[in-house]
């Protein structure tokens, strides 16, 4: 049996150790042949990308120009407007990696933990975005909401967990 002071010390050490884990910010790094590029707001897959990655980029491109709407893409994958997790769900569904539109906080438990080789889901309790072949697919940051778009602009991710589809 542990004494009260030993238990408090263990609790303090555990809280410090778990508090040290933070998700690094998203920062775009171009790697020739491995990173997607942008042309007029649309993503172009790198030549070495596997088929599911190319399909994910194509699916994200289908949503470019759609407006933002809270709850958009949740009743049906095919909607007239999308919120963050609706857009993420649409892309993952298009590559056969999601069966039901999923809210941001539930994406925190999606598939495998950690960053993916090609696709990473960043999820917090209130927002989600994707990074596909190095490009960020997002609906908002900095107090502004907009429809789904591909971005190279950096953003903090300290409130997010990183998850990825199996094998990607």
Functional labels for PLM-detected ranges:
Residues 61-81:
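Active-site nucleophile-His-acid catalytic modules used for acyl/amide transfer and hydrolysis
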């Amino acid at each position: 049996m542990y004494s009260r002071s030993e238990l408090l010390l263990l609790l303090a050490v555990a809280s410090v150790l778990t508090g040290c884990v933070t998700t690094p910010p998203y920062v775009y790094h171009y790697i020739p042949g491995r990173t997607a590029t942008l042309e007029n707001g649309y993503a172009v897959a790198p030549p070495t990308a596997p088929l599911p990655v190319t399909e994910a980029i194509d699916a994200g491109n289908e949503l470019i120009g759609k407006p933002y709407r809270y709850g958009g893409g949740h009743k049906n994958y095919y909607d007239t407007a999308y919120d963050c997790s609706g857009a993420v769900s649409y892309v993952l569904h298009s590559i056969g990696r999601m069966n039901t539109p999923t809210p941001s906080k539930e994406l925190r438990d999606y598939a495998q933990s950690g960053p993916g080789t090609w696709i990473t889901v960043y999820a917090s309790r209130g927002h989600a975005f994707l990074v596909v072949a190095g490009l960020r697919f997002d609906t908002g940051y900095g107090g502004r909401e907009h429809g789904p778009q591909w971005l190279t602009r950096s953003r903090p991710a300290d409130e997010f967990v990183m998850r990825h589809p199996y094998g990607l």
